Amino acid sequence: MAGIRSLVIAPQWIGDAVMTEPLMARLCDRGERVCVAALPWVAPVYRAMSSVAEVIELPFQHGALQWAERRALGRAWREQYDRAYVCPNSLKSALLPWLAGIPIRIGYWGECRLGVLTHRLSNPPRDRRPPMVAFYADLASVDAPSRNPSMAPDPTSPSGLSGPWDSSAPLARTQGDALRPRLHVSAEQLHATLQTHGLQVQGHVVMAPGAEYGPAKRWPVSHFAELAAALPQDVVLLGSAKERALCEAIAALAQPGKTQGRLLNLAGQTSLPQAFALIASAHRVVSNDSGLMHVAAALDVPQVAVFGSSSPEHTPPLSPKARVLWLKWDTQGQPPLDCAPCFKRECPLGHLRCLQDLSPQQVLRALSEPPTGVLARVPTGS
């Protein structure tokens, strides 16, 4: 497959972008030159991937069709790419490869995309879908014929598929290290960021208390504050500008009781590469199920990930240094947490037990114990 020019249309969320890294690695390993088209706020994720040759920042707004702009960009890309891999399931995400006339356009069934994709994979409902990292990596399983003579099919491909294809076969569920996302931070970026904030390597704990999806994925402010006050290390609060107030509330509650170390609220004050550097150099990371959770896993940093309305069986932090706390796994819980995972933005029952009942002491205990592997289930009993 040497010489194949491949365009990947990236997801719009940081966590999803991180989870596409094994797809990039697969494409690169088999000789494809990978160019990623991404919205500006996720583009830095792809610049931290060694398998990506080029990153194009798309001039689009979140949720906007912007037909004229898409058509103009599609025309500018004509004859530049041999294949396109469309990670999101939306129609508008598949329009650019179609408008560019890319001969092979691979993606999942979704949102009336029959005419704009040449190769479509079956798209099971969420409760039957593999972990998202495998879901994205499976886009590389399509062995499509090419109109370009230099793109001969790979005879070693496990799929053995050819021609316009709609798969009804089960998706691959390959496990192991090949599906672990990897990100890289340069030594220069790391040291410059630490120097700016007066921090030392492994001298601070990063807390990422936000979750863009909604409050049903956020461990309570009071719990984060109590944990921050109990830690001997410096604590760095990270998040977007929208999460600045959330982090301010944590800092206000934690500061009076924090007698050791500093508490730095850097939410909205760092670039994404700087946030990567602060995470890469951290002693530990504590987060909800969020984009920065996946960043920590991809940077191989010891972490504790708190899950509420979502499921670690669907979007786990894929790292041997990750520990997952999820009360759904607590068989001694009274009453049992039968409502999780609900995948809702807000608790439909109004109690948010999946997060309220997970104490700071339980998270502190998990932080002090050595990580045991991917999806390590931490006992959540008192």
Question: PLM ranges: what are they?
Answer:
Residues M1-S382:
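Catalytic machinery of carbohydrate-active enzymes
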